[in-house]
């Protein structure tokens, strides 16, 4: 595309319909609309779709863009929960996209101390945020699952690496080290590590786990943004870091 946003060999019809300038203004990492769309479409194709009318917790919602995306295209009601984002700003985003607080309700919340009733939500989405808090083995069972109804679904898109950062022995490949230190990459796990973590959970069933095919495109969209964080990551992507970077889709069902 001439505007610099990347393309793919098959369509992501919902996310590709958004104004690239708006997306660049609001995203904080690899394009979350594309990660969200592929995750939910793949889940639906394998029998774990997000039902219209559901009450959804969008955890780590950032600017609120993914929350508005969910409400607009999946006909769900969304509570947008984020520790660092401003709830008023997130509601402004929803209103810019033709929605209201009845569609998207932003709240200030810490993922490790969620202020919601037990079994309040039909589903949870967490797009490119779960690895900030979910690496704690106790998080899912003790902090998140109590707020999801039995039979409810959890949809995750988790940024990661093709291997554990420890496998590099403290010396990153140059295409990674030009932007990041080993310490900065410790929160990026390979898919296999997430598989082992979730397989050990007694209160969920893993419905789906795989790497997203839109990963490279989502990263390229991010480094095309005009902000210092994207600029800092751009050198790695231009040097070939996509050979190491992944995004893992995980779909869990509470038992």
Predicted regions and their residues:
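Conserved alpha-helix/loop element of class I SAM-dependent methyltransferases that forms part
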Residues: 30-51
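Conserved class I S-adenosyl-L-methionine
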Residues: 155-181
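A conserved beta-strand element that flanks and buttresses the S-adenosyl-L-methionine
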Residues: 125
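Class I SAM-dependent methyltransferase Rossmann-like catalytic core
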Residues: 17-32
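Acceptor-substrate binding/catalytic loop of class I
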Residues: 177-193
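Conserved Class I S-adenosyl-L-methionine
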Residues: 208-255
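A short glycine-rich, Lys/Arg-flanked "PGG" loop and its adjoining helix->strand segment in the class I
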Residues: 138-153
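Class I SAM-dependent methyltransferase SAM/SAH-binding core
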Residues: 63-113
């Amino acid at each position: 595309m001439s505007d610099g946003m990347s393309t793919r060999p098959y369509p992501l019809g919902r996310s590709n319909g958004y104004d690239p300038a708006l997306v660049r203004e609001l995203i904080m990492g690899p394009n979350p609309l594309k990660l969200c769309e592929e995750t939910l479409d793949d889940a639906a194709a394998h029998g774990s779709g997000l039902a219209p009318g559901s009450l959804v917790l969008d955890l780590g919602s950032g600017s609120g863009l993914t929350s508005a995306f969910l409400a607009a295209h999946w006909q769900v009601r969304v509570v947008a929960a984020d520790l660092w984002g401003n709830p008023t700003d997130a509601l402004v985003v929803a209103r810019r996209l033709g929605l209201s607080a009845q569609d998207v309700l932003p709240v200030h919340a810490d993922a490790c101390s969620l202020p919601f009733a037990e079994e309040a939500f039909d589903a949870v989405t967490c797009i490119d945020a779960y690895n900030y808090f979910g690496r704690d083995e106790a998080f899912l069972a003790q902090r998140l699952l109590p707020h999801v109804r039995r039979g409810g679904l959890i949809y995750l898109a988790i940024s990661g690496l093709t291997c554990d950062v420890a496998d590099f022995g403290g010396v990153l490949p140059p295409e990674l080290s030009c932007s990041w230190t080993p310490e900065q990459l410790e929160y990026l796990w390979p898919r296999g590590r997430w598989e082992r973590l979730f397989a050990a959970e007694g209160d969920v069933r893993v419905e789906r786990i795989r790497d997203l095919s839109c990963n490279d495109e989502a990263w390229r969209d991010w480094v095309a943004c005009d902000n210092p964080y994207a600029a800092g990551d751009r050198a790695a992507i231009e040097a070939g870091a996509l050979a190491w970077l992944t995004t893992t889709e995980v779909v869990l069902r509470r038992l």
